[in-house]
C-alpha cells in the first residue's frame, strides 16, 4: 500500500481506500445507476473485507479489500478512464480516485464521493441452503453480467458455479479468480 494511505475509518473521518481492479470493475457492473435509493448508487466497503454492490434485483459480494474499517463505507466511483490498471485508490477528502498499474504508476484519474446512507444488510439476501428445481427463469441481461464478471475474474477459464434455491428464491453464482479473489452474485428469478 502506498505511503500515507490511511485506511481506518471513523464517522466523519476522511480516508483513502484501496481496491483491486477485479473488485472495482465487478462492483461497478452490479451497482444501481441513478436509483432513488441513493445508497445503492455506490460500492459498499465492509469491515470484514468484503465489497458489495446491488441494484435491488441482483447483488455482488466479493472479497477481499485490504482496508481496515469500523463500519460500512459507501463510495460512489466514476467509470475508469482506462482498463489497464491493477488497483485504484479512492480519496474521499479530495473526491479523486486514482488508477495505478502493477508498478504503482498512476495511469488515470476519476471522481469519487462518500455516500452518507445505510447499505442494505447484504447477508440477508444470500440463500442459506440450496433446493432442487426443474425450471427457473432469469432475466437474460442479468446472466450476461454474470458472464462478464466471470470473464473479468478469469479470462482463460470462465466458470460459474450456480447454487439454486428453488424456482422462487434467489440463485447464487460463485466466481473465483486465480489470484484468490472470489465473488458471489445473487440473482432473483423471474416468474414464468
Please identify what each model-predicted range represents:
Residues 6-192:
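DNA polymerase processivity clamps
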Amino acid at each position: 500500500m502506498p505511503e500515507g494511505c490511511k485506511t481506518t475509518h471513523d464517522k466523519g473521518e476522511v480516508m483513502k481506500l484501496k481496491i483491486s481492479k477485479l473488485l472495482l470493475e465487478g462492483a461497478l457492473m452490479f451497482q444501481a445507476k441513478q436509483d432513488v435509493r441513493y445508497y445503492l448508487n455506490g460500492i459498499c466497503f465492509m469491515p470484514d473485507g468484503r465489497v458489495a454492490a446491488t441494484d435491488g434485483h441482483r447483488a455482488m459480494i466479493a472479497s477481499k479489500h485490504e482496508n481496515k474499517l469500523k463500519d460500512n463505507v459507501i463510495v460512489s466511483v466514476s467509470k475508469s478512464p482506462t482498463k489497464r490498471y491493477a488497483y485504484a485508490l479512492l480519496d474521499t477528502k479530495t473526491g479523486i480516485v486514482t488508477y495505478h498499474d502493477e508498478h504503482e504508476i498512476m495511469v488515470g484519474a476519476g471522481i469519487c464521493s462518500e455516500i452518507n446512507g445505510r447499505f442494505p444488510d447484504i447477508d440477508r439476501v444470500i440463500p442459506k441452503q440450496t433446493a432442487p428445481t426443474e425450471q427457473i427463469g432469469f432475466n437474460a441481461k442479468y446472466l450476461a453480467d454474470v458472464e462478464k464478471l466471470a470473464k473479468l475474474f478469469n479470462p482463460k477459464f470462465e466458470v460459474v458455479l450456480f447454487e439454486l434455491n428453488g424456482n422462487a428464491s434467489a440463485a447464487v453464482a460463485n466466481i473465483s479468480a486465480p489470484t484468490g479473489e472470489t465473488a458471489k452474485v445473487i440473482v432473483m428469478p423471474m416468474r414464468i
